[in-house]
A protein has these predicted regions:
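A short, charged helix-loop
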Residues: 101-120, 127, 131-164, 168
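Short acidic-hydrophobic catalytic motif
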Residues: 181
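Conserved small/polar residues in nucleotide/adenosyl-binding loops
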Residues: 193-202
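Glycine-rich nucleotide/cofactor/substrate-binding loop typically near the N-terminus or early
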Residues: 35-106
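Short coil/turn connectors at secondary-structure junctions
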Residues: 2-5, 26-28, 43-46, 69-72, ...
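N-terminal glycine-/serine-/threonine-rich phosphate-binding loop
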Residues: 1-32, 36-49
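General beta-strand structural signal in soluble alpha/beta enzymes
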Residues: 8, 29-34, 49-52, 77, ...
Length: 203
């Protein structure tokens, strides 16, 4: 019975099939969303849709997919905390041991010439992705957070060395990945605020 779970939900899909296949081969369950789920399934991987985990369909054109206690309880519950684990079991939720997420390309979309209309740009504001990233990064003692395809090889090498066991990953690597995760979400927020601040000054 597989007991390690990765949630994979990426906008930039280069390398994601190979990454997912490698961790699946190490005995991991895969959870995914939308287009990522379709990509992985089309490659022959066994994937559970996030709606099967939450018991709630993706809605509002994908605006709400992972914003659910079933996801964030799995990310934020402390494995060594008995009360956390008892509560998780009472709620019927499962731990999530790795999150692989990269974000909608807001900054790249904002730079398109001629400019896209505001409704199009607004749909490039990622909400669920940064939220998952920050939850995983906060609980990096227990959760591996992957925010860029450039990290895939390093994470796979570490997992291979640990024989697929997330708890045996070097704590310093966990800290580094968490730092890079917070840097990614911070830069993402700054790109939005800079754009809107510039627009506001024009009025």
């Amino acid at each position: 019975m597989k007991n390690k779970t990765a949630l994979i939900s990426v906008y930039r899909k280069e390398g994601v099939v190979d990454f997912a296949r490698a961790i699946s081969d190490m005995g991991w369950n895969l959870i995914s969303t939308g287009g990522t789920s379709r990509e992985l399934k089309s490659a022959g991987l066994e994937v559970k849709d996030v709606s099967e985990v939450t018991g709630h369909p993706e809605c509002f054109d994908g605006r709400v997919k992972t914003l659910h206690p079933a996801i964030h309880s799995g990310l934020l519950s402390r494995r060594a905390n008995k009360d956390d684990q008892e509560t998780l079991n009472e709620l019927g939720y499962q731990t999530i041991d790795l999150v692989c997420v990269n974000l909608y390309p807001f900054e790249e979309t904002a730079a398109i010439e001629p400019p896209v209309d505001d409704p199009t740009l607004i749909e490039m504001i990622d909400i669920g992705g940064p939220t998952m990233i920050r939850s995983a990064a906060k609980n990096h003692d227990d959760v591996i957070v992957v925010t860029s395809p450039n990290q895939y090889d390093e994470v796979l090498a570490a997992l291979s060395k640990a024989k697929g066991e997330p708890t045996k990953i070097d704590p310093e690597l966990r800290k580094k990945l968490a730092l890079e995760a917070f840097q990614a979400t911070s830069a993402y927020a700054v790109s939005y605020t800079h754009l809107r601040a510039h627009e506001t000054r024009e009025y």
